[in-house]
């Protein structure tokens, strides 16, 4: 008989290398020992997102590695998932991966800005925002961001907006900054 589930740290240490070789990183591990059967959820992301095929491949690899642990219970549910659209964007890497996506950003002065994520540096993000009837780029220091969440869109964005974000054809970013 086994003694229980591995810790979050053990799961990250065990699976981190395998996920990294596949081009993904583990963002979080949630272990629910109270669920029946117990559940281990691994949240992973990569520069190009995590599609269903990659999640299935990672899940098979993770299951094989976890099954080798002598501390794990006989029956458990393993889930490998992407962070989802409701995950707050916190790091430059999160913003880079969200390039081209529409976000709501709460700033340290309690103002809110809605825009499309453009180029992200180590200390700033460029948001494509409405400027009257046109589009403009607003540079925001990451230190001023209190909260940022990707918004679900039900209609396609304007081509000019995508181009300014650097994801829709010609890159007019430098032209609009002048």
Curated annotation (Swiss-Prot):
Main location: cytoplasm
Keywords of this entry: Cytoplasm, Ribosome biogenesis
TM region(s), chain numbering: none
GO cellular component terms given for this protein: cytosol
Ubl conjugation found in the keyword field: no
InterPro entries reported in the protein's UniProt record: Ribosome_maturation_RimP, RimP_C, RimP_C_sf, RimP_N, RimP_N_sf
GO biological process, one term: translation
Domain of life, per lineage: Bacteria
Pfam families registered for this protein in UniProt: DUF150_C, RimP_N
Annotated localization: Cytoplasm
Family: Belongs to the RimP family.
Described function: Required for maturation of 30S ribosomal subunits.
Entry protein name: Ribosome maturation factor RimP
Organism: Mycolicibacterium paratuberculosis (strain ATCC BAA-968 / K-10) (Mycobacterium paratuberculosis)
